[in-house]
Amino acid sequence: MTVTSLVDFGHFSPITEVCMWFKNLQLYRFTRPFEHSADALEKMLETVLFTPCGSQDMSKFGWVSPLGKGTQALVHEAAGQLLLCARKEEKMLPSSVVKEMLDEKVETLEAEQGRGLKKKEKEALKEEILMTLLPRAFTRHSQTFLWLNPADGYIAVDAGSAKKADDVLALLRKSIGSLPVVPVALKNPPEITMTEWLN
């Protein structure tokens, strides 16, 4: 996404409020109207619900309620604006541990067979090691909130990097089929705008 739009945060109160609430902010503008109702969006998100990692899964990514545990709604609507939450679970497998086990396995087999293992054979061994370690691996969880303002044509992602925001937008795109957005460029640097808020 290379096309950008210019926004003056100081004169756009809905976005200003979201900026103050989100710890990080990646802001995008819809290039076409977002016409999905909250109910329709809810049904689409249900097709990509978050489920925990199984014993052989490296990661899982899906939607959870933005209001936390004890609630089931995947879309929280207020005054025509929508709040979503994506949850990700990842298995933690240190590459150094995998490499050490692989090196030992390769050394043993090469000694037994009296030949060097081919690249494909090493890749197969690595896959076997991963499958052995995955059920015992620690997991890491993260949640990312999205705020949609269809009326004004904006979507904000509470992400510290464009890469993380793009991953979440890709999940939303997968859920609803299409998500035409472009990143927004600011007229004023964030530090100047925030200083103006405090004055």
Where are these regions (language model features)?
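Internal, hydrophobic cores of structured domains that mediate oligomerization or house catalytic pockets
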Residues: 115-186
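Short cationic amphipathic helices and targeting signals
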Residues: 26-29, 82-85, 153-159
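N-terminal amphipathic/basic-hydrophobic helices that include classical n-h-c signal peptides
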Residues: 1-18
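Surface-exposed, low-hydrophobicity interaction/linker segments
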Residues: 39-145
